[in-house]
Amino acid sequence: MTKIISFESSADETSVAIVEDGHIVLSNSVATQINSHQRFGGIVPEVASRHHIEWITRVLNDALNTAHVEPKALDAVAVTYGPGLVGSLLVGLMGAKTFALAHGLPVIPVNHLAGHIAAANFNKPIKYPAMALMVSGGHTELVLMREENQFEVIGETRDDAAGESFDKVGRLLNLPYPAGKTIDEMAHRGQPTIKFPTAMAHEDNYDFSFSGLKSAVINYVHHANQKEETINQNDLATSFQNAVVDALIGRTKRALENFPVKSFVLAGGVAANSQLREELTMLLNDFPKTEFIPVPMQYTGDNAAMIGAAGYWNYKKNIFADLDLNTDPGLDFELLQS
């Protein structure tokens, strides 16, 4: 049994977890900063860094105590080194390297995006070849995995990410940050009375685009305000969310038709969206040889448990880093050969 302690601090969650064999979560301590950033309508990097410094030791102690694990029982330290905010990443990275040095443990560098996908193993084992739809505030990508720990981006957003669009529409409607959950709840109370565009629906690729949709929503609201018309926010939320989900489902369907896979993973913060989960479940019914594995709801957001899961992939392939490991804020998926 391999026990890995993992550190995550790429954005506005400070988290430390202990994961066994890549799929058993012994502890997952998370300190969120949502309340601190809500009044700004988004993450303020300097504020995030200060909070990480305040919380890193506390979540570390909590993770160890909750798991009832002594440092000597650990096999390695996994840490997110990118992508993310450089100041935030540095706090987790320094914490992880300090812990590793103090206890003589090897350091495993982990791509934050790979962590989101690896969290599907907390649901059930991913079978390969597999495909993942990675949807978050900063990323919207279709990723093909011919084998474990190997990633090939076959489709990506050309402008805004899906989660970014939710937050921008949320700000337009004066909703609290982050707006995804609130819009999802509103969408269940509204009707799709507004026809918003689904970009690139007929293009022969797997890419996404959400900037046109965002602009259409902004224009709709501005025109209504100019005419002093009352906007039914629930109907707008329903219409907007339908357009986002339609785009995600359409590209996913095209990809599944052209890349037969055994597992399909839904990962990232937007993976918590109820409509997206429901419609992907229905879509996968048309692909009986492909098992749908959504990341469990409690692991869709940023957390260290998912970093431990991805860290286990690297551990098995002897992918370790020296203590001079640095952050890579712009890190994307890498094609890793075994």
Swiss-Prot record:
Cofactor, free-text remark: Binds 1 Fe(2+) ion per subunit.
Positions of substrate binding: M134, V135, S136, G137, G138, D167, G180, D184, N273
Record keywords, A-Z: Acyltransferase, Cytoplasm, Iron, Metal-binding, Transferase, tRNA processing
Cell compartment(s), UniProt: Cytoplasm
A Pfam family annotated for this UniProt entry: TsaD
GO biological process: tRNA threonylcarbamoyladenosine modification
E.C. numbers: 2.3.1.234
Gene Ontology cellular-component terms listed: cytoplasm
Molecular function GO terms recorded: iron ion binding; N(6)-L-threonylcarbamoyladenine synthase activity
Record-linked NCBIfam families: gcp_kae1, T6A_TsaD_YgjD
Record family assignment: Belongs to the KAE1 / TsaD family.
Annotated protein name in UniProt: tRNA N6-adenosine threonylcarbamoyltransferase
Lineage: Bacteria, Bacillati, Bacillota, Bacilli, Lactobacillales
Designated gene of the protein: tsaD
